[in-house]
Each structure stands twice: as C-alpha cells, then as structure tokens.
Amino acid sequence: ALEVDGVFDDCQEMVKTAFLDEEITKKLTSANSINVARWLPQMFYFFFAYKELHKQHKDLVFSVPSGNFGNICAGVMAQKLGLPIKHFVASTNINDTVPNYLINGIYSPKTSKATISNAMDVGNPSNFIRIQELFNNDLKALKNSFSSYSFSDDETREKMQEIYNTSGYVT
C-alpha cells in the first residue's frame, strides 16, 4: 500500500504515467477500470439485467452512479455489442465534468472535490473519453443514448432518506 498526498485524479495520473513505462508494465497491472479487462465481467451485469427484464417489453434504461465512468462504459460496450439498451443515465456528485460537457459541449476536466460519495470524486474520468470514442466523438449521437446529472451532498442525503422512508431500503 502507498499513501498519496492528493485526490483520486492525482493517483490515476501517477498510474497512467507508470503504465507508459514498458519495463514497469511487464510486472505491473491494474485492477481498476483503466484496464479494459475489468469491463468484460462488468458487461455481464447489463446482459443479466436484460435477461431478467426483457419479458416486460419495456425500453431498457440504466441509471449508474458514476465516478471514473468504468461501469457505465461497460454498459455502452454491451450496447455496442447489440444489447438493446435505449438510454444510460450517469449520476455524479459535484464533480460534474460530464454533466457540464453534455450541456455546453466543452469537455473541461477539473480538480476533484471531496464529497460524501467519495467513490465518485473524480474530476477527469478517464473512461468517459472511451465513451466518447464509442460514439465516434459525436456529441449529438452520445446525447441520444446518454444523459448525466450532478447532485450535491445535501441532495444525496435527501434522496437517501426519501428512499429509506418509502421503501426501508438503506442506500
């Protein structure tokens, strides 16, 4: 284990830089979503959901909490392989690089900010660039299949409480 004085984006940049060194990559791999091999098992979740839900004859829409956008990228890969997914909704916290991009068309990564949903504290999600590539960098095509919204800590707390109050489910 190694402690880094920084945020997720700082750590991710260190790992990406290390992987540029061919000597290091002979002995090092990554288990996080910058390694596309991680997407393969994640894709099965989307196929399994389809298997369970397709008999309802409704459009399939996935809402995925997103930080580095690896899980939702696996879903987009499943869609590109033919899974009939109508739309993806990526929720983020105040680290709103992707929601802002979908609003203004300018991809402008930021330094990540700490939130209560710390697994989503990513200001420059490396897998979103891959999603853009899967849509041939066509913003209009992306927006036809993909939406993203950001939520503050207060909004997150309110929804968690609402879900618990209405269903007894702890989020």
What are the residue ranges of the model-derived segments?
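PLP-dependent amino-acid enzyme catalytic core
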Residues: A1-T171
